Amino acid sequence: MPTGRFETMREWVYDAISAQRNELLSLFSRYVAQGKGILQSHQLIDEFLKTVKVDGTLEDLNKSPFMKVLQSAEEAIVLPPFVALAIRPRPGVREYVRVNVYELSVDHLTVSEYLRFKEELVNGHANGDYLLELDFEPFNATLPRPTRSSSIGNGVQFLNRHLSSIMFRNKESMEPLLEFLRTHKHDGRPMMLNDRIQNIPILQGALARAEEFLSKLPLATPYSEFEFELQGMGFERGWGDTAQKVSEMVHLLLDILQAPDPSVLETFLGRIPMVFNVVILSPHGYFGQANVLGLPDTGGQVVYILDQVRALENEMLLRIQKQGLEVIPKILIVTRLLPEAKGTTCNQRLERVSGTEHAHILRIPFRTEKGILRKWISRFDVWPYLETFAEDASNEISAELQGVPNLIIGNYSDGNLVASLLASKLGVIQCNIAHALEKTKYPESDIYWRNHEDKYHFSSQFTADLIAMNNADFIITSTYQEIAGSKNNVGQYESHTAFTMPGLYRVVHGIDVFDPKFNIVSPGADMTIYFPYSDKERRLTALHESIEELLFSAEQNDEHVGLLSDQSKPIIFSMARLDRVKNLTGLVECYAKNSKLRELANLVIVGGYIDENQSRDREEMAEIQKMHSLIEQYDLHGEFRWIAAQMNRARNGELYRYIADTKGVFVQPAFYEAFGLTVVESMTCALPTFATCHGGPAEIIENGVSGFHIDPYHPDQVAATLVSFFETCNTNPNHWVKISEGGLKRIYERYTWKKYSERLLTLAGVYAFWKHVSKLERRETRRYLEMFYSLKFRDLANSIPLATDEN
């Protein structure tokens, strides 16, 4: 399939249609007969397969050139007699064509034309020429970026190659590096070079003298014993704690000055002391260390950040020690203070993170002119409070750190927006972590945004996402799929490349997934809690009685309902928030409809409340009702157990292992999952795992080797895959062991917090240097974002009704 000029694509599609006019007329007529609307990629293919079944003469279409077009179509807009196709030949690349079904003619469409055509689904033929169009591409036109889809998510490697090539031009190209080393300070003290070194020749001479001097010292000589001599040559304390460490840094810089190399440059920048104070933003939900998991809007993100902070502090302490500095690092997790804390610590202003020495949770309330909001509110309703929250956070952070942070990390849409406001105000490096971009989780939530506005306020959220992702210095994701999806699925960030919200604005270029700001940095599970079921000496057998109570007790109450009559059967296990996207009710229905699967295994679900009246989350309440309905509709008594959300992480870890003892499996059935922390947890416990193919789990799991991919949009196939697995295990028990061990091997190779923290701090150093060297202050982009924030986001946020403690 051509991927060059748009006109070439138009001609290619036209030629493909011309070759089989009658067959394709039949297919397109079926699309048009469904009336105006949007057909997603799987619907296009499903309709094609139905057409082939009805008319066997269309079988040849399977091998036709047009089939490649159809397989790469992201969506189709049907407005009879037209069908417009968004064709995605590879991740990050889109082209648009429109077919007149009556004439079988083909037109090429620009992004703007395609989106205007799409808007007619909502607006009819209303004139959309004067709708605000957002286009960030001109601001980035001169910046380097890769072009291969395989390079997406490897931004720092590309930057290192680019920086090295610039430095190799001539000695003058090294001046920005010298300036960076001379101006780099902490608390007013120079970290690398002092005023004795004014230019590159002086630096090279000083490095040569230092190299000779250090070569005569024992490798383990403490820095304090030769500090005065090095300072006299122009070097300050940040080069290392021993003669060996300082010598390694000197050699790295000499190599860079002689012949810049990308890997050497990254190693050198990663060892420069840059990050001492970190601020992490996560405003929504109940952010605490105990009794919070399972509360509304409180789940994997809290676990992720707490594990991240512990690993990050360990790495910061290790690096500071190796750098020969006497600096105490500080990490602040900034979240919302909740006076109505529901028995948690969320009403405490400052709380030390357990397992750390210098990391704290700093809580700041949401407030308005009427005072402090005391109760929890949904993450979808926080937008009117964030600007004031950011101002208050700025003051509180300055007081706690007695200065400004070196790095600000945002989490989710609200945290990333606050991070953007703070980073712009303080002039600090900003890192974004999306966790989940709601636009991907709720299909067609952009074009039909008005239908969701009262409940979800997506207009504010999508606007905040665009501002934050364009303001960030670098973005880390857990998987490639989060950025650019896969061959058949669009990535979370990729979905923000071009979209429209009719009547509000049209995004013709929102984000470029080829931007070198994107980096894949995968987290792990806390291996003090999650470890293999076979590690008998570490097993928490004291918890087995309470676990068996959860699983098998005959008592029906607010913590568990349902019975498992045959306790000898293996258990299909799933644990998640109880919302539509996590699709726990979909798994229950999938299980309930397959008699063979019910015969082979029991089903245990952990999530949400049992009693609808205990929930305050709108979506969760609907799922609770659906779960109870499914139990009765399919008479699941005796084969199904529903357990309310569990907040004890240690017991949850042992629960995974207990399920493994039954030779059971873990299933993650979400319609979309950005990463899949529970997938990593279950695999770390060596529990065979089946997880959605939509999102990150498809990347974590090697299908058939370290687990299995499932498609929740085809529940019959999910059930068949599970049946096949259990039947194979019944005849060959080693099959269960093989998948169990394959999952564990995958975790050890790719998903640990140690590797994560090392990478994150290295990225912070490289992007700080890149921002300095390129003079990338992005004034034009910032002004554009400020205008967009002031003229669009602020009005959208302020249109959301403020919550009251009475209602």
Curated annotation (Swiss-Prot):
Organism: Arabidopsis thaliana
GO molecular function, one term: sucrose synthase activity
Compartments reported by the entry: Cytoplasm; Plastid membrane
Name of this protein: Sucrose synthase 2
Reactions mediated catalytically: an NDP-alpha-D-glucose + D-fructose = a ribonucleoside 5'-diphosphate + sucrose + H(+)
Keyword annotations from UniProtKB, A to Z: Cytoplasm, Glycosyltransferase, Membrane, Plastid, Stress response, Transferase
InterPro entries from the UniProt entry: Glyco_trans_1, Sucrose_synth_GT-B1, Sucrose_synthase_pln/cyn, SUS_EPBD, SUS_N
Domain of life according to the entry: Eukaryota
